[in-house]
Amino acid sequence: MLNDSCHNKSQIDPSHTPVPSAIMFAAGIFGNGLALVILELRRRRQAKKDGQKHSALFHILITALVVTDLTGTCLASPIVLVAYAYNTTLIWFEPIVCQYFGFTMTFFSLITLSLLFTTALDRCFALGYPYLYSRHVTKKWAYIIIPLLFVFSTLFCLLPFFKFGSYVQYCPGTWCFIDMNPVEPEHRAYANLYATIMLVLVLTIVVCNGFVVKQLFRMYQRRKRQGSIVTLAKRSNSHRKLVSMAEEVEHLILIFFMTIIFVICTLPLVVRVYMNSLGDNKESHILDLTALRFISINSIIDPWVFILLSPSVVHFFLFSVCRDCSNESRPAALFHHKEI
C-alpha cells in the first residue's frame, strides 16, 4: 500500500502544474463533442436511405462509446482542477471525494473497454455468421446489452465500498484509484480480478479483430473469383442489403486503432498490478502515476481516432492505395462506398 507521504498527503506538490490536466480536459470535451456531431450527421444521412441493421447497431455502439468517454471526462477532470485551485489533495477535501474519483476512474475504464469489446464482437458475428446475424441481431440488442454492461460495471466498481478492494490516493494528490499494491488479501484479490478482466477483454478484442481480418480476406478472394461487389449473405436477400467491402474495412480500421489505443493505455495498469502481486510489494510512485496517466488519456484519444478515421479520410487513403494497384485486379471497384 502507498505510504503516508502519498496516501494521506494534504497538499499538492508545488512542482506539479494544472496545465496538463486542463489541456486534457479541454481536448476530451472538444474531441468527444466533435465526434458526437459527426455521428449525428451520419445518422441523419443514413435516415434518408434504407437502413442497414448492422450499420444501425454499430452506430449505436460507437455513439455509446463516445458518450461514455465524454461523461467520464466531465465527471472526473473538474475535480482535479478544483484540487489544484485550492492546493488541496482529494483525500483532504473529504474521503468520499477520493472514493468517488476512484470509482469514476475505475468504472469508466471498465465500461469503455466493455463497449469496445461489444463493438468488436458485433463485427465478428456479422461477418462470421451473416445469415444468423441478419435474422436475429437488430439494433434493439444494443438497448439490452448496453444497460447490462453498465449494471455489471457499476456493481463491480462498487465492491470497494463493501470492503472488497479499496480506493486510495496517489501522488501528487490529484488521483484516486484502486489500490494497486494492497496488503490485505481481499483487496489484492480485487485488484488482480480487475486487471484480469481488463486483460481478457483486450485479448478477446484482438482475437475478434483477427477473425474479422480473416473473413474480409475471404470476401476479397470470393470477389476476385466472382468479379462483382461482395454481399454478406446472398441467400437472404429479403432480409439483407448489399454491403460493400469498404464499409467493413472502415469498421475494422476504426476498431483496430481503438484497440491499439486501449492496449497501450491498459497494459501499464495490468502489468503494474501483476508486478505488485508477484513481487516484493515495493511501492513506486512513478510507475503508479504512469499507469494512471495512461488509463486516463484513453477517453481523450478515442474520439480523435474516430474523427481522423472518418469515412472521407479512410476513402482518400483507400483510393490512393488502389491507384497504385494493377489494372487487372481493378481494386477500386472493391471499395464501392455506402455511407454508414
Residue ranges and their predicted role:
Residues 14-22, 54-119, 126-129, 133-134:
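Extracellular TM2-ECL1-early TM3 structural module of rhodopsin-like
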Residues 1-42:
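Extracellular N-terminal segment of 7TM GPCRs
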Residues 111-118, 125, 131-175, 200-207:
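Fourth transmembrane helix
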Residues 48-68, 214-269:
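Intracellular effector-coupling site of seven-transmembrane GPCRs
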Residues 264, 270-274, 289-336, 340:
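Seventh transmembrane helix
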Residues 29-43, 66, 73-80, 107-131, ...:
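Cytoplasm-facing ends of alpha-helical transmembrane segments in multi-pass membrane proteins
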Residues 2-10, 87-106, 155-200:
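Loop architecture of class A 7-transmembrane GPCRs
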Residues 21, 25, 38-40, 71-88, ...:
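Helix-to-loop junction signature of class
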